[in-house]
A protein has these predicted regions:
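Bacterial N-terminal signal peptides
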Residues: 9-20
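Sec/Tat signal peptide C-region and signal peptidase I cleavage site
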Residues: 21-27
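An extracytoplasmic/periplasmic, membrane-proximal ligand-sensing/linker region
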Residues: 34-36, 225-228, 233, 255-256, ...
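Hinge/capping helix and adjacent helix->loop/strand transition within the periplasmic-binding protein
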Residues: 38, 63-68, 87-98, 106-204, ...
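Extracytoplasmic "Venus flytrap"
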Residues: 39-54, 77-80, 161-168
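A ligand-binding cleft/hinge motif common to bilobed small-molecule-binding domains
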Residues: 104-116, 170, 174-179, 202, ...
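Short beta-strand->loop
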Residues: 120-130, 183-189, 220-273, 322, ...
Length: 350
């Protein structure tokens, strides 16, 4: 009995010590964020869906973080958000006060070894993503290309706008060129989606690829659709979106062109950006208890009735992915066989 009592006493002491440490960590978190400001660095220009989501989180996350910090949004567009990601990786302190929302294809630039990349995405702590984002390619309706087959047969390649080599615009165009023989001229360097859409209106370029949710969720597309300004050529979702029933899926096009499985695996890796959605990450080295606080607040925002209503009114779809799931996806991407990564590099550098 004495031995049993001693064991119980020791267990109680250990439990109390654990609770004390946990409470202390939470108290430190409470104390740390009080009176502080968290900066959300956005890897694109104002007005697009990345910007919208960042500002929505900025309006709601503070009330779910102990100490109720303020949030500010900072747009840092350029090089398909490589500039923003470099900044948060190399300049921002690892204190939980700076998060970044880069374009979801930013991992591509690291995979292919672009010289501008000064980060390792595997070292970030991933907070979450509000939605999964399949893509769609649109074309000016007055351009002489009514389908992907027209682009394959084209004597003059259409010009498609993009922000950089990790943008959906460039990735999907490169896949179509390499795997089905499409002819596309990518015009890169636009700061963000808003500028590409303006270039399409000016007829500087005639096509663009971006998320389905943005294409059916904001201007100028609402007006374009009413006027018949654009048509839809292809989409990357598993099935056709009800809003674009005329556009075949990439899988359908692959079937038609008998694209082999090894090429399809490369395409899946390059289009994993859609699974990443619109991710938020925090500086590498941020204390785990602060990462936990940010992740919990992120989830609570996506369950907040007012935040959900605001997202719905703005036609921003909610299909969240946790930070842990995003980290696992990034690990899978970078753990791909060397031959698969080599083929991906070939697709994007041809």
């Amino acid at each position: 009995m004495k031995k049993t009592g001693l064991v119980l006493a020791l267990l109680c002491c250990v439990s109390l010590l654990f609770l004390s440490v946990a409470s202390g960590a939470r108290a430190q978190g409470d104390q740390f964020y009080k009176g502080k400001t968290i900066t959300i660095v956005i890897g694109s220009t104002a007005g697009g869906f990345y910007d919208r989501w960042a500002r929505l989180f900025g309006r709601y996350m503070g009330k779910y973080i102990p100490g109720n910090p303020e949030f500010v949004a900072q747009n840092m567009a350029g090089a398909a958000s490589v500039i923003a990601t470099n900044h948060v990786y190399n300049v921002a302190k690892p204190d939980g006060l700076t998060v970044v929302m880069p374009l979801n294809g930013v991992y591509i630039d690291q995979i292919v070894g672009r010289s501008q990349v000064q980060f390792d995405l595997r070292k970030f702590s991933w907070i979450g993503s509000p939605s999964i984002e399949p893509s769609i390619m649109y074309m000016r309706s007055d351009a002489p290309y009514k389908s992907i087959e027209d682009i394959v047969k084209a004597k003059v390649a259409p010009k498609c706008g993009g922000s950089g080599t990790s943008s959906t615009d460039f990735i999907l165009s490169s896949i179509l060129e390499e795997m089905v023989g499409a002819k596309i001229t990518s015009v890169l360097g636009y700061p963000g989606g808003t500028e590409i859409d303006l270039a399409v209106e000016k007829n500087e370029v005639v096509c663009r690829s971006h998320s389905v949710s943005a294409h059916f969720g904001r201007e100028p597309f609402d007006t374009w659709h009413k006027k018949g300004f654009d048509r839809h050529l292809i989409q990357t979702g598993r099935k056709r979106d009800a809003r674009a029933p005329d556009a075949p899926t990439l899988l359908e096009v692959f079937e038609r062109h008998k694209v082999p499985e090894d090429s399809r695996r490369v395409a899946r890796m390059l289009l994993a950006a859609g699974e990443l959605g619109r991710p938020m990450m925090v500086t590498p080295g941020t204390p785990p208890e602060r990462v936990k606080i940010l992740r919990e607040a992120y989830v609570k925002v996506l369950n907040d009735p007012k935040a959900r209503d605001e997202a719905k009114r703005s036609r921003m779809d909610i299909e969240p992915t946790s930070g842990e799931e995003l980290e696992a996806l990034i690990k899978d991407i970078f753990d791909a066989p060397p031959e698969l990564i080599a083929r991906a590099k070939k697709v994007l550098t041809n």
